[in-house]
Every structure is written in structure tokens, then in C-alpha cells.
A protein has these predicted regions:
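Basic, Lys/Arg-enriched alpha-helical interface segments
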Residues: 1-126, 133-287
Length: 287
């Protein structure tokens, strides 16, 4: 019985089915963290969203090309009708490590989309930046494709603050004592420097920042919590073996010499599946 390894194998299988090759030397924890990071990157199109435009983007729209305007409207329609927006996403969406372009997503939940589909032979260098909260997607701005440290764009945060200040974790009553240059922000956040100067105060990452590995802190914390719960359930199943065997006999099933469990997921719950008797024990809801 090794539920953590079972979960890693479930995650590995799903990633492989999505065309993502998972290195065999990754340990169980790494596989699960990367799975959550990549899953977050793909965006959830299973629900319908409303779309809100910033004042700045509304003003800029007439200056964009007809193809760019069409792409933005198409993305809006896809969000409203539960159609995938993956065709407008970066070709790196299936990469197992994206050092810079995931930076805004992991820290502030800010996505970016190309204004051409990945099948069109992209030549347009502009990106649409947006930030979801609940069932509303906030279209922030269309800006040139950043490179390197330019992925940290203070003007994006200015637009967010001027239109939807509640989307930022902004503290006007706190001011960092050390200024972090834009080109060092990514590395500073990995070293747990969380407060960045902003409008006389500071902003904190909306999604708890990144770990020293560069992985999303929320993903790392979620995997740690799940692993702890799975370990606790392994101990609980061993502790309740006599009780479980009584239930097996009541069901008039053949009692195996050794109870062997495999972790499965059914209807949003983690399930302990006993491979000899085929009994299923509900553990806890998948968070």
C-alpha cells in the first residue's frame, strides 16, 4: 500500500495522455506538484464565464487590427460558451518547465493568450493578458510579447489596480525596506521576498508566490496536505484491519491472506480499492 505513489502514477498517466512526457527520475511529490502546475496552466473551460474589459483595453480596441479584434471576441465567446481557449495559448503549454511565462500565472493568476491560434502560423507578437476570479474573467490589456525580466510588467498591475483593485493583494500601509529591480523579481520571490513596492505601499503575490524550486507555492502546499492525509489513511486502514476483515466475511467474500489496497479516484473522492475482494473504502474528497 503506497497511496502517494499511486497518486503520482495517476497524475503521470493523465499528463502522458495530454502529450506531456514525464521524466522517470521525478519522485512522486514532484510529479504531483508539476501536475497541478500544468493543470492550472491549461485553464478550466468546463464552466461559463462573464468577461470584463479594462478601461485601457476598451480604449485600445479600435487601434488593433481586425484580426486581433476578432481573436479577442472569439476568446470572449469561448469563455462564455465553455469552449477551450487552448488554441490561443502558448505552444509551451505542455512544457514541463516554463521559467518565465508561468511567472505571472503562478504568482498573480494572470494568464496570457496569443492573438492567433496555434494552427495559424503565428506572426503577431501581441498578447492578451487576463485574470480570472470566480466566474468573471478580467481582460487587462493587449501588450507585446515580453522576454526575460519583462514578464514582470508594473503597468499591468497599474491597470488592474485602476480597474479592479480587489484583484490585487495590495497593502497601502506597508512599504518594503528594500527595492527589488524588475529583472530580479522572479528570483527574489523564489527566495521568499514577497512584498514588492507598489504605489507607495506594496503588493504580495495573489497565489502565495513560488517555492525555491520555482513551483507554485499553492501547488506544493496542496500536495503536502494531500500526502499527509493519504499517509494518515494508510495508518488508519492498517489499524482497522480486523474490522475490515469482519465486513469482508459479512459480505461472504473470500478473505485474502493479505489486504492490498490501491488508490483510485471516483466521483471526486479518493478511494481505497482492495484488489482481492474489490471492496472500496471512501477516504476523503479530492481538494
Amino acid at each position: 500500500m503506497n497511496f502517494k505513489h499511486d497518486l503520482a502514477e495517476i497524475s503521470r498517466k493523465e499528463l502522458n495522455q495530454a502529450g506531456i512526457v514525464v521524466p522517470r527520475d521525478w519522485d512522486d511529490h514532484t510529479v504531483c506538484v508539476k501536475y497541478l502546475d500544468i493543470h492550472h496552466r491549461f485553464f478550466d473551460s468546463s464552466v461559463s464565464y462573464m468577461v470584463a474589459y479594462s478601461k485601457e483595453l476598451k480604449k485600445k480596441l479600435p487601434t488593433l487590427t481586425s484580426k486581433e479584434q476578432y481573436a479577442i471576441k472569439d476568446v470572449e465567446e469561448r469563455l462564455k460558451t465553455q469552449k477551450s481557449i487552448v488554441p490561443y495559448m502558448s505552444k509551451q503549454i505542455r512544457a514541463i518547465s516554463v521559467s518565465k511565462s508561468d511567472f505571472l500565472l503562478k504568482n498573480w493568476n494572470i494568464y496570457h493568450l496569443h492573438l492567433e491560434k496555434d494552427t495559424d502560423g503565428r506572426s503577431n507578437g501581441n498578447l492578451l493578458f487576463f485574470q480570472p476570479q470566480g466566474r468573471i474573467v478580467h481582460f487587462i490589456d493587449v501588450r507585446p510579447h515580453p522576454k526575460g525580466s519583462a514578464w514582470f510588467d508594473r503597468e499591468l498591475f497599474d491597470i488592474i489596480y485602476d480597474n479592479w483593485p480587489f484583484l490585487l493583494n495590495y497593502r497601502p500601509d506597508m512599504k518594503p525596506t528594500v527595492t527589488v529591480p524588475d529583472e530580479n523579481v522572479h528570483d527574489a520571490l523564489k527566495k521568499m521576498v514577497l512584498a514588492l513596492p507598489f504605489r507607495g505601499g506594496c503588493i504580495f503575490p495573489t497565489r502565495l508566490g513560488v517555492a525555491t524550486s520555482g513551483d507554485s507555492s499553492m501547488a506544493v502546499m496542496k500536495v503536502n496536505r494531500i500526502f499527509n492525509n493519504l499517509t494518515a489513511w494508510e495508518l488508519e486502514l492498517n489499524k482497522k484491519e480486523k474490522e475490515i476483515r469482519r465486513e469482508i466475511r459479512k459480505l461472504k467474500l473470500r478473505e485474502p491472506d493479505l489486504l492490498e489496497y490501491r488508490l483510485e479516484i471516483e466521483s471526486g473522492f479518493f478511494i481505497a480499492y482492495e484488489i482481492h475482494t474489490h471492496i472500496k473504502i471512501e477516504l476523503f474528497r479530492v481538494p
